[in-house]
């Protein structure tokens, strides 16, 4: 199987995407905040602080701080579990969906602007 993208190309693309996102997107999220946001949108629910902490191998307080920021930006929403008040579910929002769509579009655009990257599967 031929290499689709080299490690150098991957780092170059990452650098371009991060730089473009700082210029063009409305939010400057940390890696942890981005990981939580992507987990909520890319993995099947339910999403709780507890399972997010376990799957990302990050402390519950750190996940709570990330969710605090994401909630204030309306990228995710907290919802109390009616059956177990200790649990808090994390839910998607329209604003979060739009942000991630724009972020994905930015990644695709930057990848297309790198002539040496083969975007087709090998």
Locations of regions flagged by a protein language model:
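N-terminal leader segment of winged-helix/HTH proteins
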Residues: 1-27
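Basic, amphipathic "hinge/linker" alpha-helix immediately C-terminal to the N-terminal HTH DNA-binding motif
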Residues: 82-103
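Amphipathic alpha-helical dimerization/coiled-coil segments
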Residues: 18-21, 101-122
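Canonical helix-turn-helix DNA-binding module
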Residues: 46-88
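N-terminal helix-turn-helix DNA-binding core of bacterial DNA-binding proteins
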Residues: 19-58
